């Protein structure tokens, strides 16, 4: 909890800040925190699962989205980028310590779950025409290849975000952008049907 550390502030020079941050353009403030102990995976609520996400910016943004939408845990395949990568930490904009992140074998995890499994895919059903449950697993796939075939086989439903542009020349959405839209739809639907 941040409250315990409010009095522990240190002023550093711009040069020191650049050394600490490892980024070309560091923020003016850097937070330090202990890497939390692994908590057991929850088996309820809405859980986001990431299959082979490679881009640190995407993972950091998805962590921030989980925080925004009140999703307390994120499950990642073992080959997803490390959540403590400096670029992930920066992109999460302070949300990282509030989200429980688990790296695990997705096939084993999904086979043990009793929640409905939704996969985001370009060829899925229109998400805007579906009633979405409060408790589910939403799987988002790799930036270039989507969700792997071995994971797709475990899905109960495949959903997509329809395109509305007339020319439809854009190939796909960025995985973090798609995650934002789908999480909004899961949460919006749950508010409508309370």
Q: Where are the regions that the model predicts?
A:
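Active-site regions of enzymes building and remodeling cell-envelope glycoconjugates
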Residues: 4-15, 45, 115-117, 133-137, ...
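Short, hydrophobic beta-strand segments that form beta-sheet elements in well-ordered domains
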Residues: 1, 9-11, 32-33, 101-102, ...
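Arg/Lys-rich RNA-binding interfaces used to dock onto structured RNA substrates
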Residues: 1-55, 187, 193-194
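RNA substrate-binding interface of SAM-dependent RNA methyltransferases
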Residues: 2, 40-124
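Active-site/ligand-binding-proximal alpha/beta "capping" segment
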Residues: 119-169
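Short, acidic/turn-prone active-site loops that include or flank metal/cofactor-
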Residues: 14-17, 79-81, 106, 143-145, ...
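Short beta->alpha connector loops at strand-helix junctions that form conserved
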Residues: 12-13, 51, 77-78, 100, ...
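Structured adenosyl-cofactor binding patch, chiefly the S-adenosyl-L-methionine
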Residues: 65-69, 83-97, 149-194
């Amino acid at each position: 909890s941040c409250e315990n550390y409010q009095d522990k502030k240190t002023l550093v020079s711009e040069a020191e800040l650049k050394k600490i941050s490892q980024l070309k353009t560091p923020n003016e403030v850097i937070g330090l925190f202990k890497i939390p102990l692994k908590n057991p995976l929850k088996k309820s609520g809405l859980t986001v699962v990431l299959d082979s996400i490679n881009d640190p910016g995407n993972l950091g943004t998805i962590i921030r989205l989980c925080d925004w939408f009140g999703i307390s845990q994120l499950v990642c395949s073992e080959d997803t980028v490390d959540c403590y990568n400096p670029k992930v930490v920066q992109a999460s904009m302070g949300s990282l310590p509030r989200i429980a992140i688990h790296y695990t074998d997705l096939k084993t995890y999904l086979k043990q779950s009793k929640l409905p499994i939704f996969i985001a895919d370009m060829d899925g059903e229109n998400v805007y025409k579906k009633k979405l449950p409060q408790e589910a697993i939403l799987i988002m796939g790799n930036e270039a290849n989507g969700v792997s075939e071995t994971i797709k086989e475990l899905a109960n439903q495949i959903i997509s975000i329809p395109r509305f542009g007339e020319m439809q020349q854009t190939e796909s959405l960025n995985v973090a952008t798609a995650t934002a839209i789908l999480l909004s739809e899961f949460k919006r639907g749950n508010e409508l049907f309370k």
